[in-house]
Structure formats: structure tokens, C-alpha cells
Amino acid sequence: MDVIHPEIAKAKTLPSKYYTEESLYKSLLEKFSTTWNFVGHASMLEQSTTIPALIGNNPVMVTKDELGKFHCISNVCTHRGMVLTEGPTNQRTIKCPYHGRTFNLCGKLKHMPEFEQAENFPSASDDLPSKKIKNWHGLLFANLPVSYTHLTLPTTA
């Protein structure tokens, strides 16, 4: 693609297909879903305990637990697939608005109404899936694939 040019006067705009073609959009979302994505700044979690974000089309949330550790977990309830939060919150737990499942800030299921007597409950599959997260000078990056572990960060002067 001949769009980027070191001299701004010779640069071109992106072809319109980048804004209109559904197949290209889906292809780009897929590519972005397999790499590190910016999901927020650490300062966003000074007044909140959770902030929602998207990696591709995948709803995630960035949390900061009681010890100040950052986590990136799924923002979709493991029970019925409900999105858990639409905006920043400042709660010690994450509660599903559908059936009331409650998770801690690491994504571990803490409570499900009327399931106190259920056998073999909860199991690990009831917890919110965790994603990798890295903090680089306050910039928070996360990725979906568990197998993708290396984040190359620029060096600072």
C-alpha cells in the first residue's frame, strides 16, 4: 500500500474500502485480536476498580485488585453471556445484572444466588477467563491468546 510517505505533503488517505467493506473490517478485527492492544491507562483505575475495553469484538475489562495488581478479564458472564459492565465502576465485586453472579476483581466466581447447596459448584469454568496484561509506564496492554506471551516494548532514553 502506497499511503504512508515520510513527507506529509505526499501522503494519501486510506482507500474508502477500509471504511466500507465488511470483509476487510472483519479481517482487521481478527488481526487486532491476536496481538497486544492498548486497553487503558493506569490512572483510569485510580478512581475506579474496573474499566471496560474491547479487543477486536471481544469485551474485556481491566481491573485493579485490593493489592493494586492489574488484571484483564472477560467482560462476559460465564452463566448466560451477559456483558457485565458498560462503564467504569468502583466496586469491590463484579455483579452480573442478569442473574446476579458475583465475581471478585480477579474474575473468580464468589457467589451465585440459590446455588449454595449445588454440588461441585463453582468450578474453574465458572470464573471469568483471564487475559495477559502488561503495564508499560502506565500504559496497559492486553491480549487474548494465552499462547502469545512476548510483548516487545520500546526502550526509553
PLM ranges: what are they?
Residues 150-157:
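Single conserved hydrophobic/aromatic residue that forms the stacking wall/gate
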Residues 146-148:
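Glycine-enriched catalytic-core subsegment of oxygenase/oxidase enzymes
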